[in-house]
Amino acid sequence: GTRGSLPASITSNQIEMKLNKILELLSEKKSITYSDLKNIISTAQFSVSKAYGTNTSCVQIDDGNKENYIILDAGTGLRDFGNYIMKNTNIKINKTFHIFISHTHWDHIHGFPFFTPAYIPGNKIIIYGVHNELEKNFETQQSQPFFPISLKMMAAEKKFIQLSNKEKYNISGYEISIIEQNHPGKSYGYSFIKNGKKIVYSTDAEHKEEVIGSEFIEFFRNSDLMIFDAQYTLVDSEYIKCDWGHSSNFLA
């Protein structure tokens, strides 16, 4: 998921607009086959054939390991990921899930109560983060009157590990570095390196002029994939929503 603050599904009006555009493309052909239809849909521009957003922040780094999973943030996308694991793996237990939290604002953790593998005995959930009281924040989210099932009632083994942005770590074969980011309450970006490939996860971060060209450039340098907060237009990030803790595609 990539949606900020709240999950948002595609609306019926948006679906209708996409279908109308497909019909418009079809009308340009004198005759049409099923193969033509599939080709039109697959080659149509992104806004017509696909969608983005929907769930809040949750990203899997998939290196093919079906026993140890690397997950970045626990937004509502974690529910879909858990359902995928339950549907597509023959063995549902004895799996380890490493979940790295950028910060504990609600949209980055509120998928965890709906993560099915966390309810299965034999699974192990390790949650990493730099913020103090990481475990307490997860417990509070699942306390009465907010949620009926407490964190302790989830049957998988759960472990919380506090990291430091001053240290480097080796976890599940990844060399991991962390950087502090400008966001209300602070957020943290992560760099993952394995087999000569580098992924940077940097969400919920505002980059002002004074940090451009500083440690962030080195942190991002040589990334094979960079996941970057580009929520705002340049005008929003510089004026209307300055100091809200987010960035723009222009700065990316």
Predicted regions and their residues:
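DG-centered beta-turn motif at the end of beta-strands
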Residues: 202-204
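Cap/insert and terminal regions of metallo-dependent hydrolase folds
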Residues: 45-47, 208-252
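Binuclear metal-dependent hydrolase catalytic cores
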Residues: 1-200, 210-211
